[in-house]
C-alpha cells in the first residue's frame, strides 16, 4: 500500500508539472507564428538573444539554491520552524544577489555600445529576474505540492496570451513581447509568495548572518553546475546572435524551443521524482524509472523525426526553411536530456553524490568550449556546428554520470 501511495504522489506531481509546463510552453509557441509574422524574424532574434543573456543572470540570482533548497525542504518538511528558517534565508540570499547583479547589469548597459543602443529591450527583459526572488518553486517542489506551481504558472501564461494580441500589432511593437512575459511572470510570482505566506502558513523570519552564509555556501557547488548547464543550453543562441546574426539566432531559438517542448514530459517526471528519491533513497525504485524514461524517450524521438517538418511550418511558416534540418539535428540532444537529468538529480544528488553531479557538468562545458575553440581556429561557424557542440557536450555529461552511477551501484 505504501508503494502504491508513493507511485500515486509521483504520478499526480508529474501530471501537474506536465500540465503547467505544456501550457507554459505551448501558449508562447502557439503565439510564435503571430509574433514572427508581426515583429519579423530579426526582431524576434534580438528578443531571444537578450533573453539568453538574462538566463545567465538568473543563474547568479538563484545561485544553486533552487536545487539545494529542494533537498532541504524535502528533508525537513514536517518541521515548521526549520522550514521557516530555510525559506527566509533562501529568499534573503536571493534578494542580496539580485541587488548586486542589478548594479552590475546597469553598468553594462551604460558601457557596452550594443546594449546601450537597445537599452529599453535589455531593461525590459531584466524585469523577469524578479520572478526568481519571489516565486518559491523550490519550496512547493520540496513538499511535493506541484498543483500550486500549476495554478501559479497558469496566471503568467494567461496574462501573456490575453495581452499579446492586443498590444503587439506592428513591427515596432516588438518590445511588448518581453514586457508582457515579464509582467506575467512577476504577477504569478507575487501570487505564489502570497500562497506561501497565507495558505502554507510559512512565516518569514529575519535570518541571521550566519544562516545566510550557510545558505550561500550550500548553493555554491550547484551554482557552478547550474551556470555550466545554462552555458550549455544558451551558448548556441548567444553565439549565433554575435557571429551569425539575429536571423540565425531566431532559427536556433525556434528549433531549441520545439526540442525543449518535446523534452517536457521527461523533464517533469524527473522533477517529480527528485524529492521522492531524496526522501526514500530506494535504488530499485530509481532503476525502474530509469528504464521507463529511456524507453519513452526512444519512442518520442522516432515520432518527433517525422513530425518536425509540420511543426516548423506551423510555427514559422516559410520564413525559416533551415529550421527543419536544424531541429532534426537536435533530436540526439532531445534523447539525452531526460536521461541526463534523471540520473543527475534523482540518482547522484538524491543519493548524496553531488560532487560527481557537478563535475559532469563542468566536463560537458569543457567539451563544448573546446569545440567552440576549434570552430574559431578553423573559422567554421554555422548553426549545425553549434547544435553538434550542444549534443556532444550533453553526451559527455551522460557518459560521466552513468559511469559514476555504476560506481555507486545505482545502476
Q: Which residues fall in each region the model found?
A:
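Transmembrane helix-bundle signature of multi-pass secondary active exporters and lipid flippases
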Residues: 51-59, 229, 252-271, 300, ...
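Hydrophobic alpha-helical transmembrane segments
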Residues: 126, 150-200, 256, 363-367, ...
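Membrane-interface junctions at transmembrane-helix termini in multi-pass inner-membrane proteins
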Residues: 119, 129-151, 270, 275-279, ...
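Helix-loop junctions and terminal segments of transmembrane helices
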Residues: 62-78, 259-281, 344-350
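Interhelical loop/hinge segments that connect adjacent transmembrane helices in multipass membrane
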Residues: 1-10, 147-150, 174-181, 190-233, ...
Amino acid at each position: 500500500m505504501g508503494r502504491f501511495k508513493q507511485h500515486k504522489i509521483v504520478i499526480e506531481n508529474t501530471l501537474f508539472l506536465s500540465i503547467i509546463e505544456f501550457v507554459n510552453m505551448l501558449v508562447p509557441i502557439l503565439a510564435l507564428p503571430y509574433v514572427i509574422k508581426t515583429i519579423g524574424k530579426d526582431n524576434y532574434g534580438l528578443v531571444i538573444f537578450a533573453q539568453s543573456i538574462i538566463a545567465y543572470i538568473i543563474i547568479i540570482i538563484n545561485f544553486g539554491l533552487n536545487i539545494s533548497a529542494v533537498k532541504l525542504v524535502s528533508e525537513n518538511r514536517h518541521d515548521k520552524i526549520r522550514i521557516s528558517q530555510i525559506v527566509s534565508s533562501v529568499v534573503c540570499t536571493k534578494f542580496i544577489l539580485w541587488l548586486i547583479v542589478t548594479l552590475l547589469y546597469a553598468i553594462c548597459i551604460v558601457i557596452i555600445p550594443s546594449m546601450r543602443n537597445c537599452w529599453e529591450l535589455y531593461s525590459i527583459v531584466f524585469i523577469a529576474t524578479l520572478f526568481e526572488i519571489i516565486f518559491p518553486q523550490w519550496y512547493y517542489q520540496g513538499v511535493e505540492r506541484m498543483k500550486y506551481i500549476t495554478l501559479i504558472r497558469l496566471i503568467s501564461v494567461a496574462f501573456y496570451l490575453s495581452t499579446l494580441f492586443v498590444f503587439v500589432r506592428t513591427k515596432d511593437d516588438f518590445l511588448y513581447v518581453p514586457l508582457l512575459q515579464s509582467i506575467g511572470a512577476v504577477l504569478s510570482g507575487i501570487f505564489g509568495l502570497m500562497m506561501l505566506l497565507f495558505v502554507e502558513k510559512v512565516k518569514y523570519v529575519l535570518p541571521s548572518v550566519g544562516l545566510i552564509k550557510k545558505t550561500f555556501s550550500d548553493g555554491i557547488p550547484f551554482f557552478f553546475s547550474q551556470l555550466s548547464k545554462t552555458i550549455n543550453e544558451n551558448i548556441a543562441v548567444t553565439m549565433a546572435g554575435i557571429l551569425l546574426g539575429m536571423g540565425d539566432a531566431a532559427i536556433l531559438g525556434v528549433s531549441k524551443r520545439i526540442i525543449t517542448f518535446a523534452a517536457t514530459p521527461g523533464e517533469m517526471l524527473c522533477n517529480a521524482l527528485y524529492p521522492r528519491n531524496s526522501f526514500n533513497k530506494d535504488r530499485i525504485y530509481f532503476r525502474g524509472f530509469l528504464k521507463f524514461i529511456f524507453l519513452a524517450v526512444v519512442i518520442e524521438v522516432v515520432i518527433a523525426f517525422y513530425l518536425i517538418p509540420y511543426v516548423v511550418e506551423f510555427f514559422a511558416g516559410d520564413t525559416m526553411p533551415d529550421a527543419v534540418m536544424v531541429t532534426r539535428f537536435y533530436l540526439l540532444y532531445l534523447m539525452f536530456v531526460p536521461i541526463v537529468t534523471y540520473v543527475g538529480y534523482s540518482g547522484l544528488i538524491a543519493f548524496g553524490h553531488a560532487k560527481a553531479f557537478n563535475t559532469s557538468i563542468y566536463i560537458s562545458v569543457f567539451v563544448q568550449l573546446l569545440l567552440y575553440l576549434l570552430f574559431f581556429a578553423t573559422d567554421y561557424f554555422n548553426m549545425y556546428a553549434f547544435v553538434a557542440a550542444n549534443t556532444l557536450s550533453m553526451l559527455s555529461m551522460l557518459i560521466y554520470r552513468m559511469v559514476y552511477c555504476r560506481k555507486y551501484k545505482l545502476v
